[in-house]
Each structure stands twice: as C-alpha cells, then as structure tokens.
Amino acid sequence: MNTARLNQGTPLLLNAVSKHYAENIVLNQLDLHIPAGQFVAVVGRSGGGKSTLLHLLAGLETPTAGDVLAGTTPLAEIQDDTRMMFQDARLLPWKSVIDNVGLGLKGQWRDAARRALAAVGLENRAGEWPAALSGGQKQRVALARALIHRPGLLLLDEPLGALDALTRLEMQDLIVSLWQQHGFTVLLVTHDVSEAVAMADRVLLIEEGKISLDLTVDIPRPRRLGSVRLAELEAEVLQRVMRRGHSEQLIRRHG
C-alpha cells in the first residue's frame, strides 16, 4: 500500500447499533470497528442490512439505538468529511461536467475540479454535457465530485452494478488506485463477491442485521485476477451465504 498518502482516513466505531422500521429489525446491535484508511466491502443477501448500514454512515438515516462514531466523535458532527457514490451517478443534465464536479462549492473551485477530473481520466471532457458520456464516464464524474472534497470516508453503494464487465474492472482499478493515493476510508456495498474480494482489505457478510463473517483479504496488491487465493476467498464467502440460504429453505420446507 502506498505510504505517501494525501490525507488521513476516518476511523469508524459502531457500538451496539440497531435500526428498526416499525417491527422490522434491519440492524441488530451491530458492533464494528474500521481503522482509518481501511478498504472494507460489505456483502450479503438483499434485505440483510447492507444499504441501511451505509445510509446510517452517510447521515441519511439515524440509528434506533447505539453510537456511530468517527474515533471518539459522533460521525454526524463531521458529516462534511463523508462522500457517497450510488449506482446512478446522479449528475444534473443541465450542468456541464465540470459544474457537476463543483456542485455546491463556492469561491475558486474550477482548478480543483479540473485536477479531480484529471485524476479520473476525464480532463478533456470538462465542458461537455452529461448526456454525451457513457455510463462508466458518468461514474468517473461522480468519483471526481467526491474527490474534490478530499473526503476522509468514501461510501460506495453498488456504484459499478450497472456497468459492463470491462468498464467495471477499469473502475475497480481506478477506485483502488485513488484510495491508495489519498488514504480515505472506504466502505463498499456490493452483491458481487468477486468484486469485494478483489478490491477490499476486509469483507463483511451481514445477515439478519448482524455481521456473520469478518474476513481479512490477505493478498498483496496489485492483485492478479484469476489467482488461486482470490478464488479461495470468494468461495469461502459464497459458501457461507449459500449455506444460510439452504438452511432457510429447509426451515420453510419442514416448519
């Protein structure tokens, strides 16, 4: 990992965090510590609590119980240090690419926006409209929009899910490269276990609102696609997910 990082990531500490929607318990007294600058991927079946966890960290929702901290400080108090990317790039079609990157900023921000676009390989598209961009290019703009704020925490909610296979691999490499350069903490939610293992330091499996697997990805970078160790770790996570699904089917069948 590159030690010459530009900024320090946000350390995260969740203590007995729960989130309820009426009688539905989505997160159930979840405990989690993520050191500053770590890249963590969260996987699991739909409805297990992955996106809810991300929304709590982004300040889009509040926990029913428990504490969400950045070190010893409530994360909500430093929310400006957090940026989030979604599957939809959410660009404003009536604003140019560079204006989308600088959205909400005041003062002399255009040079910083150009640097952010250069970092994602789009320095020559600054004056164009979002409609002229491919899906992968739109996500690069969304990434540049996050970078310009020099975040301590980058939250990724399935940002690559709608991309074709080659573009997806290119974006994976770009995100990892920028993470290594800048040192922010990353939390990636994905349904793609191979993506999680390829990108992250650590993979969490959330089931029924709790962390049921916390797996360290002990593979040096850069990682070689198709390596035996990557395949072994991917299989370990998938077997755990499938075992839980098989158990639920047996319960329904014999209950």
UniProtKB/Swiss-Prot annotation:
Residue numbers binding ATP: 44-51
Indicate how the chain sits in the lipid bilayer: Peripheral membrane protein
What organism is this sequence from?
Answer: Shigella flexneri serotype 5b (strain 8401)
Q: Which PANTHER family match?
A: ALIPHATIC SULFONATES IMPORT ATP-BINDING PROTEIN SSUB, TAURINE IMPORT ATP-BINDING PROTEIN-RELATED
Quaternary structure (record):
The complex is composed of two ATP-binding proteins (SsuB), two transmembrane proteins (SsuC) and a solute-binding protein (SsuA).
Q: What is its main location?
A: membrane
Record's SMART domains? Answer: AAA (SM00382)
Provide the gene name from the record. ssuB
Q: What's this protein's name?
A: Aliphatic sulfonates import ATP-binding protein SsuB
Q: Which GO terms describe its molecular function?
A: ATP binding; ATP hydrolysis activity
